[in-house]
């Protein structure tokens, strides 16, 4: 035993080589959030996520998942086609034929029951007499046109049925008409969620953002004395809001502010910390948006760093790890590594795939800005490596960075360096500069002394 020696560096390095880096597919699978997102989404909202995954997962499994997802809806023709694909059959069971007939009959029934009130609500002379007072509106329609509560409720039932059939545009209109007249707060809240989903599924982003505000207001007022109900409903709203968040540019600022607000950041930290991925992606890509003021962006970045630091034990992925490496640990090598992994995760995420290039671009800017702040002389080759670029690409990148950010710096092409003309350093920067080289040695010495105090 006494003759044993620690393993050599060569042994350790050869051992590391036996565990090669994960492939992009392995990274994407490891950080796939679909199982966490599904419980907070309506089944119709889950469908586009499954569609997106069909290019990444086993096609047969995706088809089966679609069937299980939609078999209880009234999208009878589509569900029947999925059944035929799963069972490799040209024929469908009688139950599908029967259900289709029932759905068509029900649609006809709802159309007849709601015909009078829908016609009235399309009559400009009638609509002109409606006011913000729902009770007065109902009284007017009842006295002047014979409208009943049952007719109003038929709009709700018809809208829900159209939604179940996949007729989202019709559903949105019917639920809107119901909401204008109904005084049933529970049904109005349900109709608002239904209209929100319908606007998402028809990609009507401006209308969807109007529903975000209505749902938010409903949560605050209807559930003001029900903290658990508020937590659950806020969690749903956060997840549903991901659709306009990354598909409608004007939504970005509104939803970033909403997610950072005390009630919603608390919801994220308590109930769904994986949403930090989307918040981090939004904040980092916000850097590229020309209208974004520096002070607002710095505030968002500061808030993001704080939350990522707090929640690191609860949730992390390459996107949040990138933030931690760069702004908490000041580890540029780790930040560059995590940026590479983050790119794989972003390209495999339904909500973030379109932001991938913008994220990588912004992240490289953040790495280079942070690196330049704490170094006086920068080796172009070294910085290029940290940005994941070759030397020529890195040189062009740095030239553009100096031009775009107007930093006081000059490039020494002969030496392959950038000379930063920093203003007098803050205490914060001086501490980083002085400790970055000594930190590792200090920690090792302290560790050795703790283990071997008498040596």
UniProtKB/Swiss-Prot annotation:
- This protein's GO CC annotations: eukaryotic 43S preinitiation complex; eukaryotic 48S preinitiation complex; eukaryotic translation initiation factor 3 complex, eIF3e
| Subcellular location per the Swiss-Prot or TrEMBL entry | Cytoplasm
**Can you list the disulfide-bonded cysteine pairs?**
none
One biological process GO term for this chain? formation of cytoplasmic translation initiation complex
Q: What is its main location?
A: cytoplasm
Under Pfam families, the record lists: eIF3_N (PF09440), EIF3E_C (PF21357), PCI (PF01399)
PCI domain span: 256-425
Q: Name the protein family.
A: Belongs to the eIF-3 subunit E family.
- Function field: Component of the eukaryotic translation initiation factor 3 (eIF-3) complex, which is involved in protein synthesis of a specialized repertoire of mRNAs and, together with other initiation factors, stimulates binding of mRNA and methionyl-tRNAi to the 40S ribosome. The eIF-3 complex specifically targets and initiates translation of a subset of mRNAs involved in cell proliferation.
Protein's name according to its UniProt entry:
Eukaryotic translation initiation factor 3 subunit E
Q: Could you tell me which species this protein originates from?
A: Neosartorya fischeri (strain ATCC 1020 / DSM 3700 / CBS 544.65 / FGSC A1164 / JCM 1740 / NRRL 181 / WB 181)
The encoding gene: int6
């Amino acid at each position: 035993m006494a003759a044993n020696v620690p393993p050599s560096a060569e042994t350790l390095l050869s051992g590391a080589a036996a565990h090669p880096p994960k492939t992009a597919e392995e990274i994407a699978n490891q950080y796939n959030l679909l199982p966490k997102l599904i419980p907070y989404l309506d089944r119709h909202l889950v469908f586009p996520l499954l569609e997106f995954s069909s290019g990444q997962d086993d096609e047969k499994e995706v088809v089966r998942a679609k069937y299980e997802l939609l078999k209880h809806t009234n999208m009878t023709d589509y569900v029947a086609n999925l059944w035929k694909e799963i069972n490799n059959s040209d024929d469908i069971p009688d139950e599908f034929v029967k259900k289709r007939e029932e759905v068509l009959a029900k649609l006809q029934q709802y159309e007849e029951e709601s015909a009078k009130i829908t016609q009235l609500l399309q009559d400009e002379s009638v609509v002109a007499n409606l006011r913000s007072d729902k009770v007065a509106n109902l009284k007017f329609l009842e006295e002047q046109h014979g409208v009943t509560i049952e007719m109003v409720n038929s709009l709700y039932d018809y809208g829900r049925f159209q939604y179940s059939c996949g007729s989202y545009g019709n559903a949105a209109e019917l639920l809107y008409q119901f909401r204008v007249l109904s005084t049933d707060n529970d049904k109005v809240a349900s109709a608002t969620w239904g209209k929100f989903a319908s606007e998402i599924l028809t990609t009507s982003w401006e209308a969807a953002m109007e529903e975000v505000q209505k749902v938010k207001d409903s949560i605050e007022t209807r559930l003001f004395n029900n903290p658990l109900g508020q937590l659950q409903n806020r969690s749903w709203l956060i997840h549903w809001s991901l659709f306009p968040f990354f598909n409608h540019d004007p939504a970005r600022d509104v939803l970033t502010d909403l997610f950072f607000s005390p009630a919603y950041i608390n919801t994220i930290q308590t109930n769904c910390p994986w949403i930090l991925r989307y918040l981090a992606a939004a904040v980092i890509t916000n850097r590229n948006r020309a209208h974004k003021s520096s002070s607002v962006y710095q505030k968002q970045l500061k808030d993001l760093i704080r939350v990522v630091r707090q929640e690191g034990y609860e949730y992390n992925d390459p996107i949040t790890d990138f933030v931690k490496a760069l702004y908490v640990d000041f580890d540029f090598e780790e930040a560059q590594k995590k940026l590479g992994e983050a790119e794989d995760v972003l390209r495999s995420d339904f909500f973030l795939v379109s932001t991938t290039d913008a994220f990588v671009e912004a992240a490289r800017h953040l790495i280079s800005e942070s690196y330049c702040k704490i170094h006086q002389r920068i080796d172009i080759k070294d910085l290029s490596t940290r940005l994941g670029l070759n030397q020529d690409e890195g040189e062009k990148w740095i030239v553009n960075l100096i031009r775009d950010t107007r930093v006081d710096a000059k490039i020494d092409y002969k030496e392959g360096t950038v000379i930063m003309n920093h203003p007098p350093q803050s205490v914060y920067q001086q501490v980083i500069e002085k400790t970055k080289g000594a930190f590792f040695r200090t920690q090792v010495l302290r560790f050795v002394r703790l283990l071997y105090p008498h040596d």
